[in-house]
């Protein structure tokens, strides 16, 4: 198992949680972004900078991900693609996307996109709460423990 992080929009506090988990477990972890993402110098923690552009980082993750890898992303279409390839997808808010839930999330995303394109103000996501941070860390720990066995 490897961890792939869609680091372009990943909150710093979540990146720090991922780094701590990778350090503790030794799982290989790669942060993929179109800008420099500072990561500690560890043999199992990497940063991959891709060219700027629409979905370039997402496409790189999809190209490299393998079954049973874990992708950290809040990008619903990316989560759908990696789940289709047999990987796990976890949002930075602690939601584990599954084959059963991702289609509904895509429908909601598409509906909100339609509303925004018609001029309706939908607002952005709320700030990351302590509960969501804890939920993320707990899900990450459970996934890593499952695959360490």
UniProtKB/Swiss-Prot annotation:
InterPro entries: UPF0178 (IPR003791). Pfam families: DUF188. CDD domains: PIN_YqxD-like (cd18720). Belongs to the UPF0178 family. PANTHER family: UPF0178 PROTEIN YAII (PTHR35146:SF1). This is UPF0178 protein VV1_1847. The lineage of its organism: Bacteria, Pseudomonadati, Pseudomonadota, Gammaproteobacteria, Vibrionales.
């Amino acid at each position: 198992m490897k961890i792939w992080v869609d680091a372009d929009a990943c909150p710093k506090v979540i990146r720090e949680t991922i780094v701590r988990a990778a350090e503790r477990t030794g799982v290989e972890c790669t942060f993929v972004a179109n800008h420099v993402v500072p990561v500690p110098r560890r043999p199992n923690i990497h940063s991959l900078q891709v060219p700027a552009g629409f979905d370039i980082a997402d496409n790189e993750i999809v190209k490299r991900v393998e079954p049973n890898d874990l992708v950290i992303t809040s990008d619903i279409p990316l989560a759908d693609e990696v789940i289709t390839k047999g990987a796990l997808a976890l949002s930075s808010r602690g939601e584990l996307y599954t084959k059963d839930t991702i289609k509904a999330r895509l429908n909601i995303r598409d509906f909100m996109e339609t509303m925004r394109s018609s001029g309706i103000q939908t607002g952005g996501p709320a700030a990351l709460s302590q509960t969501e941070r804890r939920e993320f860390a707990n899900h990450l720990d459970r996934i890593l423990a499952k695959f360490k066995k």
